[in-house]
């Protein structure tokens, strides 16, 4: 078997890039003949099709990337195998997806979303994303490198640090977390909340809205937003610096930070919905709040990015659920429990580590992807 991997390559410290790069590492370590390529680099991809002659091209992304991940390799006779996340609904490419022998999805929620919007369930196999469990390991708060991070963030030894990571914090549930933390601030005031976000125009606007909310709640002085790039090598230390990973995402097809935090022995506070409920075990590796609100849309504007020749408005026969908001009372209860019961947190942290070791080792993921391709893609095993 010879595989070409199409993803955000060269690797960047971002979710889809990490997903692809860990698959590449796992396949290589398993002895599979494979090479990575940038999903948007048409010239390089065509050159690799002709010179490398892969038996299949595994593409990492969402359905909007289908021109790069599926249509392009197929034009050159290469069997495409997309490994897809979701963004709430599938607006196009149903025929192209249904013509494939194998579609990998990152969670059952992603599969359900695609099936609701016209993709055959028989085509899809759930394959969670892998985690580098040798890099993401538990470290004590007394570790010099962990203490250095907490000191740089201004977190005292007796304060609990909550961490959220995302392109923007609001999509990862930061506003729900702020409301929850404000509810319990008088009962347990010794906490700090740090959000790691990407510096971009959209994020800047969203940050201002988040800060306004924090100001109105009287907790702005306890909120820190980090911008700029952090390397993959640094992230295990940042996770270990926190006491709770707070990720009640509004939309989440998997939840890579949730898994990485658990690998570091950090309990997760999130929401019982979407891909998250498949990565976090409520009461065992973290706390999952109920859904406070289901967000539905009845129409959506689509255009070139979604494969249409021009902008148009698509109206649905019935509303589609595309996101959630976590119940803030539940989040407050979970946060208070995790911040005040160190013994339970210790047990959850140990269980979280075992959970990731059993279910999300990137090497096991790579072997399963290899087996699925050999089983489902005609000619891949012998190529």
Segments predicted by a language model, with ranges:
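A short, well-ordered alpha-helix in the C-terminal region of glycosyltransferases
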Residues: 316, 330, 336-337, 344-358
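Conserved donor-binding/catalytic core segment of Leloir-type glycosyltransferases
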Residues: 156-172, 178-181, 194
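Nucleotide-activated donor-binding/catalytic signature segment of Leloir-type glycosyltransferases, i.e.
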Residues: 207-229, 233
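Short alpha-helical donor nucleotide-sugar binding micro-motif in glycosyltransferases
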Residues: 237-242
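Short hydrophobic beta-strand element within catalytic cores of glycosyltransferases
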Residues: 267-270, 280, 287-289
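Carbohydrate-associated surface elements
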Residues: 109, 130
């Amino acid at each position: 078997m010879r595989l070409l991997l199409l993803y955000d390559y060269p690797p960047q410290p971002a979710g889809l890039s990490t997903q692809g790069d860990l698959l590449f590492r796992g396949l290589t370590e398993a002895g599979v003949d494979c090479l990575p390529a940038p999903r948007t680099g048409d010239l390089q991809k065509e050159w690799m099709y002709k010179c490398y002659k892969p038996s299949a091209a595994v593409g990492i992304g969402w359905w909007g990337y289908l021109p790069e991940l599926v249509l392009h390799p197929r034009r050159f006779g290469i069997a495409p195998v997309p490994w897809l996340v979701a963004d709430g609904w599938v607006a196009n490419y149903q025929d192209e997806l249904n013509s494939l022998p194998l579609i990998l999805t990152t969670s059952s929620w992603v599969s359900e979303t695609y099936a609701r919007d016209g993709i055959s369930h028989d085509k899809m196999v759930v394959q969670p994303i892998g985690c580098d469990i040798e890099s993401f390991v538990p470290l004590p708060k007394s570790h010099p490198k962990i203490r250095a991070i907490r000191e740089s963030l201004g977190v005292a030894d007796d304060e609990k640090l909550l961490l959220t990571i995302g392109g923007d914090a609001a999509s990862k549930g930061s506003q729900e977390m702020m409301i929850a933390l404000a509810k319990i601030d008088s009962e347990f005031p010794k906490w700090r909340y740090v959000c790691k976000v990407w510096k971009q125009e959209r994020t800047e606007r969203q940050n201002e809205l988040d800060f306004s909310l924090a100001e109105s709640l009287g907790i702005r002085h306890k909120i820190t937003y980090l911008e700029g790039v952090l390397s993959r090598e640094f992230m295990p230390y940042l996770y270990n610096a926190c006491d709770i990973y707070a990720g009640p995402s509004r939309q989440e097809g998997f939840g890579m930070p949730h898994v990485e935090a658990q690998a570091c022995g950090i309990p997760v506070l999130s929401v019982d919905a979407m891909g998250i409920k498949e990565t976090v075990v409520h009461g065992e590796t973290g706390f999952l709040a109920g859904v406070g609100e289901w967000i539905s849309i009845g129409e959506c504007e689509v255009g070139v990015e979604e494969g249409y020749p021009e902008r148009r408005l698509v109206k649905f026969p019935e509303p589609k659920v595309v996101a959630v908001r976590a119940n803030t009372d539940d989040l407050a209860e979970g946060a208070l429990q995790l911040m005040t019961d160190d013994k339970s947190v210790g047990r959850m942290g140990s269980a979280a580590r075992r959970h990731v070791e059993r279910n999300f080792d990137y090497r096991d993921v790579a072997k399963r992807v290899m087996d699925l391709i050999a089983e489902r893609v005609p000619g891949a095993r012998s190529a």
